[in-house]
Curated annotation (Swiss-Prot):
Transmembrane segments: none annotated. It comes from Salmonella dublin (strain CT_02021853). This is Fatty acid oxidation complex subunit alpha. Residues 1-190 are annotated as: Enoyl-CoA hydratase. Pathway: Lipid metabolism; fatty acid beta-oxidation.
Length: 715
């Protein structure tokens, strides 16, 4: 084999063939179409060597087995037939691996996903390391696809149909011990002995196929299967609202394989893969994947980042505690928390303890790893321990004089190079830096709640922020596991600015008599994870509406909400889930009682609560205002690109990923259609729907947000 091959064969003295996987020039192994010839050449050598006792496939990369197939291959397909052929080629290659006459072992360390797991499933046995980096899964559904190289057929036969359905329909990734319990792997070992353990397994005679648990055998039979698939179809339809065609095809293909045999199953899998690859949903989901990958590579500015060895946090509340956790436990950086009292510090420490203890209980980490991570977090009621911090994140109340005071204190007590990053959601960063001695080192870093779950952060430089400050802050966000977008220092920044008109319109429809559950259901049907009214309950009605006056002052009446309604709700001490009183009823511990609306809400705002609009009309009214505002943000350069705008909306507020983000969605609709729809709505509901100048210009010139030079392909 040549040195440029991604697959290298070495026959050991004990007659076990070790195939090392190492894609040249890449940090991560991915499967590409051109590798098929390399693998087939190796398989030919293995078949011809009659002295071989077994084969081990192992990665030569430091922390991944195979992270999946190269998604660019799908983008190169011009039609469903070409994509189907791609799947059949993958199926054939996996069949050749499975047909080898000697035991074949997959030795897995790190990510084993998508096509990587399909290759491992084609092996006769699998063994993996107990490392936290080791995860196994089939995430193709997240790209609007299904596993196309035999995964839908081999996985149910190995782990059982219910486990396989759960894994493939959700794309969930199993850690080592979970994979062992499910029967996906045969053993879990330390990384230091992975190869030798795999070699020993390869020397053994091929063992009989694993016997499935009784429950899985019943579910695979005709009666159990019929019941299971009926329930899965119902549950999946409720979850996807029909917006993700891949889920229904996954269920069909798995059922076909079980009912009609694997040959029919493989055929159905390849056909479905080809057809799904051409759907607009898959194209949009792949575009989101490529865009997020590009954003994660974007350094934020041309300047090199400054030092980033330790971080300080001001405020130990909900946001401060969450920021401390992602900084220490995700980023591995020492964190010092300052709060005005020890209760705040203890709250922040408990926040991290609770999250880490949950990981220990679920066996994701060991107790000593929990203690090691927690030791990175310390606290104080003064600035002791802050003198050497490279960056300090402020997470105190939304009060401008207080935040300006924090800037002065940090400049006085920290190093000359220390960056001050404000977690404000509404105050201009330029105002926070107005009295700063070093305004070039002041920046916004807007996290979303809950911090440990929300993937997006907005990085907000003001007019005087230096390029190095931007680069350092972006670097920190990435270390925290976040996807950062750089946005301009204008009221509401980007995410809140496009979210508020959407929520305001939902409140306005409520005052017109539309029912809460009807409004929320309409937007969930459209593709949002929760409706706007429920979202307001979740984030806190007081918190969610606090920014409305700020935006109204900056941009005018189009940001006004029915003030009397908001005031009535807040005056009735309704803050949402956090105090158990909101638009919805809450049971014990803040749990909603089957999403039941509190009927008292209608009397409170003086309406009967009788819906007149269709779900489509409700969704259109909310979404069109969001899209119009997003176009304004693009025009005003609040965001740097359509890419950042799409990622910000998908990751920040759950804009439907299958639509690709607001800018891809507007491109799909066309600027002419956007303008016509907004004009129609403006005639019905008022000037807040008037199409912005950007859309009008684009309609006249027949332009799009995503230019012809920007494609769905990765770089």
């Amino acid at each position: 084999m040549t040195t440029t091959s991604a697959f290298m064969l070495n026959v050991r003295l004990d007659n076990v063939a070790v195939v090392a996987i190492d894609v040249p020039g890449e940090k991560v192994n991915t499967l590409k179409a051109e590798f098929a010839a390399q693998v087939r050449a190796i398989l030919k050598q293995i078949r011809e060597n009659k002295a071989l006792q077994g084969v081990v496939f192992i990665s030569a990369k430091a922390d991944n087995f195979i992270a999946g197939a190269d998604i660019n291959m799908i983008g190169h397909c011009q039609n469903a037939q070409e994509a189907e052929t791609l799947a059949r080629q993958g199926q054939q290659l996996m069949a050749e691996i499975q047909a080898l006459p000697v035991p074949v072992i997959a030795a897995i360390h790190g990510a084993c996903l998508g096509g990587g797991l399909e290759m491992a499933l084609a092996c006769h046995r699998r063994i993996c390391t107990d490392d936290v980096k080791t995860v196994l899964g089939l995430p193709e559904v997240q790209l609007g696809l299904l596993p196309g190289s035999g995964g839908t057929q081999r996985l149910p036969r190995l782990v059982g149909v219910s486990t396989a359905l759960d894994m493939i329909l959700t794309g969930k990734q199993l850690r080592a011990r979970q994979a062992l319990k499910a029967g996906l792997v045969d053993d879990v070992v330390p990384q230091t002995i992975l190869l030798e353990a795999a070699v020993e397994l390869a020397k053994k005679e091929r063992l009989a196929q694993r016997t499935l648990p009784v429950r899985e055998r019943i579910l695979a039979g005709p009666l159990g299967r019929a019941l299971l698939f009926r329930l899965v179809r119902k549950k999946t339809a409720q979850k996807t609202q029909g917006n993700y065609p891949a889920t229904e095809r996954i269920i069909d293909v798995i059922e076909t394989g079980l009912a009609q045999g694997s040959s029919s199953g493989y055929d159905a899998e390849a056909r479905a893969f080809g057809e799904l690859a051409m759907t607009p949903q898959s194209q949009a989901l792949r575009a989101v994947f490529f865009a997020s990958t590009e954003v994660k590579k974007d350094p934020g500015s041309d300047a090199p980042p400054g030092p980033l060895n330790s971080v300080g946090i001001l405020g130990g509340g909900l946001m401060g505690g969450g920021i401390a956790w992602v900084t220490a436990c995700k980023g591995g950086l020492p964190v010092r928390i300052k709060d005005i009292n020890t209760q705040g510090i203890n709250h922040a420490l408990k926040y991290s303890w609770d999250l880490l203890e949950t990981k220990v209980r679920r066996r994701h980490i060991k107790a000593n790893e929990r203690d090691k991570q927690l030791a990175l977090i310390s606290g104080s009621t003064d600035y002791r321990g802050f003198s050497h911090r490279d960056l300090v994140i402020e997470a105190v109340f939304e009060d401008l004089p207080l935040k300006q005071q924090m800037v002065a204190e940090v400049e006085q007590n920290c190093a000359a190079h220390t960056i001050f990053a404000s977690n404000t959601s509404s105050l201009p960063i330029g105002d926070i830096a107005a009295n700063a001695a070093r305004p070039e080192q002041v920046i916004g870093l807007h996290f979303f709640s809950p911090v440990e779950k929300m993937p997006l952060v907005e990085v907000i430089p003001h007019a005087s922020t230096s390029a190095q400050t931007i680069a350092t802050t972006v670097k920190l966000a990435k270390k925290q596991g976040k996807t950062p977008i750089v946005v301009s220092d204008k009221a509401g920044f980007y995410v809140n600015r496009i979210l508020v008109p959407y929520i305001n319109e939902a409140i306005r429809m409520l005052t017109e008599g539309e029912r809460v559950e009807h409004i929320d259901a309409a937007l969930v049907k459209f593709g949002f994870p929760v409706g706007p009214i429920q979202l307001l309950d979740e984030v806190g009605i007081d918190t969610g509406t606090k920014i409305i006056p700020v935006l109204e002052a900056a941009y005018g009446e189009r940001f006004s909400a029915p003030a009397n309604v908001v005031a009535s709700i807040l005056n009735d001490d309704r803050k949402g889930r956090k105090n158990g009183r909101g638009f919805y009823l809450y049971g014990e511990k803040g749990r909603k009682s089957k999403k039941q609306v509190d009927p008292a809400i209608y009397k409170l705002i003086g309406v009967q609560g009788q819906s007149r609009l269709s779900a489509q009309q409700v969704a259109e009214r909310c979404v069109m205002l969001m899209l119009n505002e997003a176009a304004r943000c693009f025009d005003e350069k609040v965001i740097r690109s359509a890419r950042d705008g799409d990622i910000g909306a998908v990751f920040g507020i759950g804009f439907p990923p299958f639509l690709g983000g607001p800018f891809r969605y507007m491109d799909a609709l066309g600027p002419g259609e956007m303008v016509a729809t907004l004009q129609r709505l403006a005639a019905l509901y008022g000037p807040r729907y008037a199409p912005c100048e950007q859309l009008v210009r684009m309609a006249e010139r027949r332009e799009h947000f995503w230019t012809n030079g920007e494609t769905d392909q990765g770089n």
